[in-house]
Amino acid sequence: MKKKSFFAVTMSITLLLTLLAGCSDPGAGSGGGPSGGDSAGQTGGEASRLKVAWICDGVLTDGGWNTNGYEGMQKLAEEYDLEVSYQENVPQTDVGDVLRNYASEGYDMVLSNEQYHCEPMVEVAADFPNVTFGCVNAYVSAENMIAFSGTLWQHNYLAGVMSGMVTKSNKLGLITFSTDSDSALTYLSSFRAGAQSVNPDIEVVHVATGSFSDLAAGKEMATSLIDQGCDVVYCNSGDCNATVMELCIERGVYTISAIVDRNGMSDEYVLGSTVNLPSTQLRMMVEGKLSGTHTGNVTPIVGGIEDGIEAFLVNESLQDKLDASVFEAIDEATAEIIAGNVTVELP
């Protein structure tokens, strides 16, 4: 299988940032107020330290989505000498107040790791035109708000292709937080479409944990799927992800990681990892602000595997354990997606 190097992914992000320069409002970020001062990395006079606030709806130690976002912000803070404030466990009912407080306190950027924070963020952003806001995987945006999103289907489609190639029972299991949200249905549609593109007889059994942190529920769902004959189980439900993978490995069943790369958990039973890292989007936001090339976009900008925003990372340890046709199918599907020849019916 052809490997996409870190350099290639980095170049994709760099090219996307360059293209975004043409999408920015030329007047955004100029004038008085917090965002009107010098930013870190600027030349000509003493540069002020960029103040950035970052919030999430869960805990920093979830080992996945929020951990990746938090660690990404820590790296950015060190790399660009940012002054960063972090706040975890922000409930949806408090998002507007938390964002407003940060903006009122003189922060240059106010960022969220949670896509469902984008609606209250748009409302708050209207009252603080000199502050740059940003939301990961946002589906609405504003003139002074940076909004990126992964397609949320391309990497899942590829995971489905690989699962469809390796299954012997023709039955795959998918675990998400719910079974009726748009994101869950997107995961289901794309995973199933990928699998059925190489194996029309595939059935996907979809169940929900109802919680991002109920590990017992995750284990119960995984056990049920395996007992029903699913020989590949894919979980995207927060803290439950690693627990489900551990159970699958114990039971000798193929599994797939969501959000972060957990391929190292097993060189035999982890097929790969669907990666949609918030840290990638956060870096694009901060670097766009620092360079002045991007401080807002009214319409969220969607990027996929070609842009490096999301990816399906095949477990390289399986290269000599699975038939070459498995990896050829993934390569072919990847090329077709990039060429725009793959469509998936989404909610």
Model regions and ranges:
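Hydrophobic alpha-helical membrane-embedded or membrane-associated segments
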Residues: 13-16
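C-terminal motif of bacterial Sec signal peptides marking the signal peptidase cleavage site
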Residues: 18-22
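A residue-level marker of the well-folded mature domains of exported/periplasmic proteins
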Residues: 23-347
